[in-house]
Amino acid sequence: MSVRHVTTDHAEIRRWVEERGGHPAIVTGVEGEEGILRLDLPGYSGQEFLQPVGWDEFFRRFEAKALAFAYEDDGRYFAFVDRTPRRV
């Protein structure tokens, strides 16, 4: 059974991605937009729309958007989630 984790630790995120043969990327957006963060993992579709970026640039954008990384330890599921606490 997969266990879901949520982290903001850069080393943990990078390790998870690299263990799956992936690398950081962005989806090039509309002119003037910064691009949407993505991870390019082998076998996923849409790779023709991805632009590789370095880890420093990836994490700069990750922090600027106040994201966290949700993932399963034994699979390839991941999502970028808002790390800002929600008010009820």
Where does each model-flagged region fall?
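A charge-rich, low-complexity, intrinsically flexible signal that marks solvent-exposed coils, linkers
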Residues: 1-88
